C-alpha cells in the first residue's frame, strides 16, 4: 500500500486538463490548487459577464468582459504561486485539441455547460484512453460521473432527453395551460412593444387557430360573425404608439380587451375554464399595497401580489420608454440579466397567469424559464467541485472505489445526507461511441431524404459528428466529403446516389478519431428528411427518439420558439443536469 508521501507525489506530478472556467470551473481550479495539484491547464472560450460575479468567486467587477480562463489563471496564481497553471481562451472544438493533445494529460475534468462540447470531450477521452470526470449542476441538484474506457459507461451510453423548447403558437396566444406559456407570451409582448417586431410573435388572440386539445373544434361561422361586430385587435406596437405608451391603456389592451375578444371564441372554452379579463385599476387594488419596483426586484424569490405586478408593469413601461426615446435608432433586445426588462417580463407573465387561473411564480423562477436555463447555485457548484477533486484523487491513486455522485441540496435522503453515490455502470454494448461494435441503424425514406439531410440531420445533429466523411461500403464511392469535394451531391436524394434499403455507409470523423457503420433501413411512412434511429437491427427505438427536419412541420402546427440561447450561456434546458457557467 503506497504511503501518503507517494500518493502526494502522484498528485503533484499528474497533469490535469480542466475544460470550463465558469461556476463549477472556478471552484474546481481553487480546489485543485489547495489540494496540491501543480500541473493544470484550463480551456474556456467564454468571457466574464456581470451576472457571473455572484457565484464565480475568482472574478471581480474589474474583470467583466475579460477571458474567464485567463482571469481564473491569474487569480489562482496569486494565492498559489507554486502552481503551474496555464490556459487557452479557445473553443474545445478547435482542431488542435485532438487525440494527441488529450494524451498529454493524465486526467480530464469537465466543467462544461453544453451537450455538444461534452460529447466531443467524451469521444476524445475515449480515443486517447484518458479518464474523464464529467460534472454538472442545475439549481439545487448536481452530479459527478467518472468515465473510464472499457470500465464504465461513457457520457453517450444513455440518451439524454431534451426538454421541450417549442410550443404551438395557438397555445401561447389563446390557451396557455402552464406558466411557461405565459412567460413565452410575455417575452413576445416585450419584443412587440420595445424590440424587433416578429410577425410570428404576435400576442393578440388568433381567431383562426385550431384548439390544440380539440382538433375538431373550429371557430363557427356564428362566432366569426359575432366577432366581426367588434373591432379586430390591432398590433401591439401600433396600439401602444397611438396611446403614447400609457401604461394603464396598454395594460387594458393586453389583459382586458384582448381577453374579452378571446372569450368570444366559444369553442375554446367547452372543455377548459374561461379566462377572466382584468382591468388595470382592479389589478392595482388587488393584493394590498404594491411594492415599488426596487423593492420587488430585491424580493425576487417571493411571488409578487397582483397589485405589485401591475405597479412593476407600469413602472417598467416608463423606464423602457425613456431608454427608447434616448436612443431612438436602437431596438432593445431581451436580456435575462437586464433588471428592468426581466421585471417587465415577470410582471406580464404573472398577470396573464392570474387571468388564466395558472399559479403565479417568483421572478427568480420566471427568469430561469425566460432565459431557458436552470439557475446556478454557488453552494451546489462548490459541492460538485469538491466531489470532482475527491474522485480525481481516487483515479490517480488507482483506487478501485469509483462511484457516480448525485446531489440534492434542498432536502436530505433518509440517511440524512444531501448527496449519495452509485456504483458505476459498465459500458453499454450498443453505444456507438464506446462499444467495440460501432453500428447505428437508421430508418429513412431514400426517395425523399437528401444526402445533405443525412449529413446535417443524422450525422451532425443526432450523432454529433463534426466533419464526417461518408463512403458507400458496397461501391467505395464517397458521397460526403469534409473537404467539400462532393457538395454537388448534397441536394440529391439518397436513391439517386444508389443508397437504398440495406445500404451500409462507413462514416469517419477524423477530428474525433471516430468511425461508425451506418445501416440504412427503409421507412416508407417517413417523409422528407425525417428519420428514426435504432440501436439494433431488430426494431427502431421508441417514437421519442425520432428527429424531424426543421422544415417538415405542417403550417397549422407552426410552433413559436422560446428564445434558444446558445451553449455559451449555459442554456441547454434539458432533463439531464448541466452546469450553468454564464
Curated annotation (Swiss-Prot):
GO terms for molecular function: ATP binding; metal ion binding; SUMO activating enzyme activity; transferase activity. Its EC number is 2.3.2.-. Residues 204-235, 531-582 are annotated as: Disordered. GO terms for biological process: anterior/posterior pattern specification; embryo development ending in birth or egg hatching; nematode larval development; protein sumoylation. It comes from the Eukaryota. Pathway: Protein modification; protein sumoylation. Gene3D superfamilies: Ubiquitin activating enzymes (Uba3). Chain: B, domain 2 (1.10.10.520), Ubiquitin-activating enzyme E1, inactive adenylation domain, subdomain 1 (3.50.50.80), Ubiquitin-like 2 activating enzyme e1b. Chain: B, domain 3 (3.10.290.20). Residues 204-214 have a biased composition (Acidic residues). InterPro entries: ThiF/MoeB/HesA, ThiF_NAD_FAD-bd, UAE_UbL_dom, Ub-E1_IAD_1, Ub_act_enz_dom_a_sf, Uba2, Ubiquitin-activating_enz, UBQ-activ_enz_E1_Cys_AS. The active site is at 170 (glycyl thioester intermediate). The keyword DNA repair does not apply. Zn(2+) binds at residues 154, 157, 431, 434. Residues 219-231, 531-570 have a biased composition (Basic and acidic residues). GO terms for cellular component: cytoplasm; SUMO activating enzyme complex. ATP binds at residues 20-25, 44, 52-55, 68, 91-92, 113-118. Keywords: ATP-binding, Metal-binding, Nucleotide-binding, Transferase, Ubl conjugation pathway, Zinc. Belongs to the ubiquitin-activating E1 family. Heterodimer with aos-1. The dimeric enzyme acts as an E1 ligase for smo-1. It mediates ATP-dependent activation of smo-1 and formation of a thioester with a conserved cysteine residue on uba-2. PANTHER family: SUMO-ACTIVATING ENZYME SUBUNIT 2, UBIQUITIN-ACTIVATING ENZYME E1. This is SUMO-activating enzyme subunit uba-2. It comes from Caenorhabditis elegans.
Amino acid at each position: 500500500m503506497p504511503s501518503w508521501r507517494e500518493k502526494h507525489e502522484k498528485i503533484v506530478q499528474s497533469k490535469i486538463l480542466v475544460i470550463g472556467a465558469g461556476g463549477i470551473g472556478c471552484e474546481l481550479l481553487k480546489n485543485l490548487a489547495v489540494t496540491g495539484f501543480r500541473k493544470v491547464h484550463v480551456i474556456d472560450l467564454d468571457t466574464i459577464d456581470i451576472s457571473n460575479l455572484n457565484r464565480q468567486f475568482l472574478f471581480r467587477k474589474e474583470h467583466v468582459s475579460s477571458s474567464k480562463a485567463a482571469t481564473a489563471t491569474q487569480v489562482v496564481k496569486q494565492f498559489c504561486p507554486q502552481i503551474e497553471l496555464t490556459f487557452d481562451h479557445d473553443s474545445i472544438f478547435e482542431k488542435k485539441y485532438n487525440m494527441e493533445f488529450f494524451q498529454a494529460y493524465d486526467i480530464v475534468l469537465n466543467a462544461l455547460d453544453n451537450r455538444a462540447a461534452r460529447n466531443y470531450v467524451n469521444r476524445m477521452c475515449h480515443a486517447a484512453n484518458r479518464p474523464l470526470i464529467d460534472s454538472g449542476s442545475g439549481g439545487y441538484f448536481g452530479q459527478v460521473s467518472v468515465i473510464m474506457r472499457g470500465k464504465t459507461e461513457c457520457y453517450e451510453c444513455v440518451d439524454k432527453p431534451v426538454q421541450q423548447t417549442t410550443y404551438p403558437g395557438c397555445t401561447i396566444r389563446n390557451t396557455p395551460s402552464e406558466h411557461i406559456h405565459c412567460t413565452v407570451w410575455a417575452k413576445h409582448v416585450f419584443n412587440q412593444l420595445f424590440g424587433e417586431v416578429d410577425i410570428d410573435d404576435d400576442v393578440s388572440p388568433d381567431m383562426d387557430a385550431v384548439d390544440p386539445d380539440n382538433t375538431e373544434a373550429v371557430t363557427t361561422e356564428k362566432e366569426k360573425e359575432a366577432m366581426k361586430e367588434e373591432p379586430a385587435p390591432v398590433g401591439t406596437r401600433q396600439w401602444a404608439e397611438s396611446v403614447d405608451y400609457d401604461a394603464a391603456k396598454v395594460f387594458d389592451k393586453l389583459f382586458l380587451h384582448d381577453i374579452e375578444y378571446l372569450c368570444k371564441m366559444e369553442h375554446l372554452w367547452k372543455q377548459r375554464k374561461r379566462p377572466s379579463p382584468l382591468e388595470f385599476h382592479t389589478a392595482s387594488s388587488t393584493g394590498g399595497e404594491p411594492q415599488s419596483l426596487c423593492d420587488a426586484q430585491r424580493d425576487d424569490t417571493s411571488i409578487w401580489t397582483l397589485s405589485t405586478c401591475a405597479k412593476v408593469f407600469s413602472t417598467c413601461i416608463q423606464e423602457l420608454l425613456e431608454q427608447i426615446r434616448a436612443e431612438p435608432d436602437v431596438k432593445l433586445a431581451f436580456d435575462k440579466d437586464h433588471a428592468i426588462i426581466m421585471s417587465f417580463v415577470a410582471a406580464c407573465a404573472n398577470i396573464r397567469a392570474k387571468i388564466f387561473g395558472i399559479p403565479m411564480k417568483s421572478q427568480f423562477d420566471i427568469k430561469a424559464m425566460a432565459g431557458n436555463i436552470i439557475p446556478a447555485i454557488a453552494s451546489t457548484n462548490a459541492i460538485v467541485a469538491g466531489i470532482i477533486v475527491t474522485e480525481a484523487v481516487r483515479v490517480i491513486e488507482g483506487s478501485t472505489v469509483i462511484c457516480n455522485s448525485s446531489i440534492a441540496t434542498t432536502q436530505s435522503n433518509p440517511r440524512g445526507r444531501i448527496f449519495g453515490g452509485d456504483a458505476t455502470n459498465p459500458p453499454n454494448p450498443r453505444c456507438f461511441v464506446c462499444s467495440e461494435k460501432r453500428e447505428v441503424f437508421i430508418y429513412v425514406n431514400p426517395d425523399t431524404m437528401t444526402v445533405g439531410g443525412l449529413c446535417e440531420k443524422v450525422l451532425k445533429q443526432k450523432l454529433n459528428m463534426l466533419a464526417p466523411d461518408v463512403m458507400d461500403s458496397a461501391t467505395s464511392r464517397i458521397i460526403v466529403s469534409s473537404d467539400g469535394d462532393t457538395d454537388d451531391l448534397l441536394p440529391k436524394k439518397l436513391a439517386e446516389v444508389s443508397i437504398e434499403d440495406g445500404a451500409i455507409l462507413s462514416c469517419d470523423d477524423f477530428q474525433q478519431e471516430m468511425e461508425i457503420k451506418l445501416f440504412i433501413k427503409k421507412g416508407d411512412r417517413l417523409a422528407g428528411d425525417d428519420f428514426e434511429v435504432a440501436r439494433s437491427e431488430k426494431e427502431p427505438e421508441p417514437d421519442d427518439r425520432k428527429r424531424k427536419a426543421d422544415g417538415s412541420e405542417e403550417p397549422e402546427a407552426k410552433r413559436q420558439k422560446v428564445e434558444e440561447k446558445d451553449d455559451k450561456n449555459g442554456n441547454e434546458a434539458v432533463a439531464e443536469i448541466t452546469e450553468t457557467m454564464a
